[in-house]
């Protein structure tokens, strides 16, 4: 999944995610086109929707014979927003985007960001990539997440730190998803020898050193729990 900053306005946006503070003004959301502001204001008023923390609402909007999916997500009081709460909001929003089979999502923010740009990028990338994870390797008709890109429409003082955060978040998410893959594999696929091979490939990919212990050294180190698990496999 591509995650980046929106450098210039685009004429058509397939899916729009609005992260808005409670009692905030949609008309003041950075870079959000006026026609979308008007549409959102109408729905918010008609449905009496409030942007309380983790509140969610999605609806379609048609303009010039093109459909835009709009996802509203409340952040509540921005002063209470921390890394974990923000990560949860991204997960909620991305999950909804995947549910409606969005391919490209644009995130707009209607609050004063209390997080550092490094943490903002990190939480955004990590939450998005963890949310889209699917283990469908053995399905007859595997279906991956439709979401291919997320663009952030936000004025940042230091885009470099945001991009660095996105990179860090991506690394964290990829590591977690790798662990998920290993746990989800059956015992006849992941056993001590094959696990060592996976570890070697990961070390080569990310550039860190690795030492694979043999049976004798594992016994000398008294890694009894590891040995007990390994005995569950014929290999």
Label every PLM stretch briefly:
Residues 1-235:
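Short amphipathic alpha-helical segment within the helicase RecA-like ATPase core
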């Amino acid at each position: 999944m591509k995650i980046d900053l929106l450098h210039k306005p685009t004429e058509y946006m397939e899916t729009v995610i609005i992260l808005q503070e409670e009692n905030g003004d949609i008309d003041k959301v950075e870079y959000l086109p006026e026609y979308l502001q008007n549409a959102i204001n109408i729905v918010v008023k008609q449905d009496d929707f409030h942007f309380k923390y983790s509140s969610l609402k999605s609806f379609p909007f048609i303009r010039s014979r093109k459909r835009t999916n709009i996802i509203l997500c409340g952040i509540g009081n921005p002063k209470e927003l921390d890394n974990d709460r923000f990560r949860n909001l991204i997960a909620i929003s991305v999950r909804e985007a995947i549910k409606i089979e969005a391919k490209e999502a644009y995130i707009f923010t209607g609050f004063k960001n209390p997080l550092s740009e490094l943490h903002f990028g990190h939480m955004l990338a990590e939450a998005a990539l963890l949310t889209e994870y699917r283990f469908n390797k053995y399905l007859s008709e595997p279906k991956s997440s439709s979401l291919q890109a997320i663009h952030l429409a936000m004025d940042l003082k230091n885009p470099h730190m945001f991009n660095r955060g996105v990179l860090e978040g991506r690394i964290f998410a990829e590591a977690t998803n790798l662990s998920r893959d290993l746990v989800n594999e059956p015992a006849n696929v992941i056993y001590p020898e094959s696990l060592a091979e996976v570890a070697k490939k990961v070390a080569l990919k990310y550039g860190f050193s690795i030492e694979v212990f043999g049976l004798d050294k594992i016994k000398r180190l008294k890694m009894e729990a590891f040995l007990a698990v390994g005995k569950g496999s014929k290999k």
